[in-house]
């Protein structure tokens, strides 16, 4: 099943106060295959002029269709993420969601578009996610995907009906619980995510994140030395699903 990146899909990204991460992520997004076919909405907290400048510069690239929305006041990660998704689904049927520290590989958008098409009618699937902590001996599974009863918020995509099933239980206060924990533990209701065995997203958020105690912890638990950008190989246009037992990298075994 070939992808068709011109269906009713957009990219949304939440930005806050980490300009270096924002720059790395947007530079990578600008290099993605098919980025010209997806509108990109950048939702900025109103606290870092440098982040807003980096986002605005991205919108000037001739091959992207992007715009910046700056909040009137700081609302926190939970509300900003809700606003990004709500905006996306107010205008589109399918949304690809990113954060300032989720660096996409070159074929991430094509992968997400493929997954959104492949699993649209499969109500056992809640989301498609580009992140995976790929073991070195699994890098050869370049076009394989697995499903797991989990939710990962780093470079993910979903559909309007799935969004409508979780939006009413969205947490507003960052001090209580993170939005992704609510989805994973409560509102996805057993539905799974689909992930590539060879990661298409790199998490670079070692500093300044809400739930990362430091660079050493991030390096041990989130950073993936083996992903599509460090493992050269042929272009993938079609992925296929394999049994979850094929990988040692199920999130249930490595939940951080």
Q: Which stretches of residues belong to each language-model region?
A:
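Peripheral/terminal regions associated with large enzymatic or DNA-binding modules
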Residues: 1-98, 102-256
